Amino acid sequence: MKHIVKNIHFVGIGGAGMSGIAEVLLNLGYKVSGSDVGSNAATRRLASLGATVMHGHDAANIAGANAVVVSTAVSGDNPEVLAARSKRIPVVPRAVMLAELMRLKQGVAIAGTHGKTTTTSLVASVLAEGGLDPTFVIGGRLNSAGANARLGTGDFIVAEADESDASFLNLFPVIEVITNIDADHMDTYGHDFARLKQAFIEFTQRLPFYGIAVLCVDDPNVREILPFVSKPVVRYGFAEDAQIRAVNARAVDGQMHFTVLRHLNGHAEPPLDVVLNLPGLHNVQNALAAIAIATELEVPDAAIVKALREFHGVGRRFQRYGEVATADGTGTFTLVDDYGHHPVEMAATLSAARGAFPGRRLVLAFQPHRFTRTRDCFEDFVKVLGTVDALLLAEVYAAGEAPIVAADGRALTRALRVAAKVEPVFVEQMEEMPQAIMNAARPGDVVVTMGAGSIGAVPGQVVSHQQPLQAGGAA
């Protein structure tokens, strides 16, 4: 970036995507400041690294800034944004700043409706094990690194490419992954699925002539756009025509064992026997994307196998909190947390839980995310929520949206009771959810907390406060 830009301010610095970029810029030697409405692990980490973090938004916060970075979650009437515009300080969208970072390295961009964070983390881990020391910016905390971003000394930067606001079209990577294409964030695309698919086609057109599009051909919508991708393609998945193909996949003690058949550049690579330290067939697909990239970049097979076997996961992606004592003290239940908030990814995670813990009762504590998504996917939510053995259902996490009639937690509860697949317990306040979990959990249960909103704090509360919690509370 130009030498005149020395001080960079982030509005909403605690967000997953924003904090990662801020950390990389700190490590590059820039002076970084930022504001957010509250404190979280990301803001505390950035402060410990030297960033100036302010709580609350105020025009005075941008003093001395040469550029102000904003995400789509920041409204145009934010006082810091208004002050920056009045002072003619550049207001830079998060994706544009990420694109600038990609110009410093060779970009590997991971796109898709589901699986971006896990796939990005797997790619970064495999490349790191292969000695390529990548820079990475991830939407979740990579447990092995203790952070969601890192400045590496190697040539590559691995980052998520966000289709939710079409901002991935700002990026110009040399390698792209598309994990899947599903109907989500449809407001961005005028509720026109064809426009969403066209955006992914345009994303592949950002590649240079020597670039590679790594595409999951198990997904019917990815397969549908395949004829319109003009750049070199590597197909991965379980499908017979996949060039990076998994066969004989099976769940063993919470891990996935499978063999990878590889046919690239006109010849077959030796089969690769893999143990992935994650559950679920969807994570096998995510790992195949990492294997495809690693094989293209000539990472040794031994490094690929080691990275996947020793993968420590990502925060809030099937994150295991271990065993928790039941309220009556007669046994324990297993507590798992996941970020899933779309019916497709929820179904994949619940299937993975069944595979990882066969024969055990599955209890789901779910907080829907956004009223628009609840409205648009209402019947699919009812279907997937009806597959669990017991359900605790919270009110929708609004994420800034106004309520929509018949698209809230109570409406889902009523629909589930009519469907008669599971008897849901509606938990009106999130503060009541830890107690509701303790009330519901029996010895031997697997309890999964799920959602992209405030429910992410609940597992820690259950673990840290399990002693004071007794039977009773929310019904």
From Swiss-Prot:
SUPFAM superfamilies: MurCD N-terminal domain, MurD-like peptide ligases, catalytic domain, MurD-like peptide ligases, peptide-binding domain. Signal peptide: none annotated. ATP binds at residues 112-118. Keywords: ATP-binding, Cell cycle, Cell division, Cell shape, Cell wall biogenesis/degradation, Cytoplasm, Ligase, Nucleotide-binding, Peptidoglycan synthesis. GO terms for molecular function: ATP binding; UDP-N-acetylmuramate-L-alanine ligase activity. It catalyses: UDP-N-acetyl-alpha-D-muramate + L-alanine + ATP = UDP-N-acetyl-alpha-D-muramoyl-L-alanine + ADP + phosphate + H(+). One of its GO terms (cellular component) is cytoplasm. Its EC number is 6.3.2.8. It holds the Pfam family Mur_ligase_M. Pathway: Cell wall biogenesis; peptidoglycan biosynthesis. Its main location: cytoplasm. The keyword ATP-binding applies. It is found in: Cytoplasm. Gene3D superfamilies: Mur ligase, C-terminal domain, Mur-like, catalytic domain, NAD(P)-binding Rossmann-like Domain. Belongs to the MurCDEF family. Cell wall formation. This is UDP-N-acetylmuramate--L-alanine ligase. The gene is murC.
